[in-house]
């Protein structure tokens, strides 16, 4: 059973699940946030306005994702590809997420590559590459009210 403290993050469940699937056997924790080290560094390499380039610490990551479900709700994640690095601490995962924009009901699809460093079975560094144009386009439609899906 998922810890009730993570209930506000259910909009991200498909992301959490595919991330844990990609890192299975390498990290400990029942929930994605439990796999994150307290002093983790998150880097977002392709960003859009309002999104940070870097976060320091697990609590900062949790705070960033706290309002995610107000804008986007994911209903699936797939296309997982796992790459091993020459550095045994590093895993590269590719995946796609699918969802909808809350304000408009428009579809949201994005692709990611995440370079993840693990130490002592916790994620200590996460470098994220995403299709920021897809995110910007979807969210700008939401802010202008364009493309209401049926």
Would you name each region that the model predicts?
Residues 15-25, 49-54, 69-73, 94-96:
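Short, mixed-charge, low-aromatic patches
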Residues 14-17, 34, 63, 67, ...:
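Charged/polar, solvent-exposed surface patches and flexible loops
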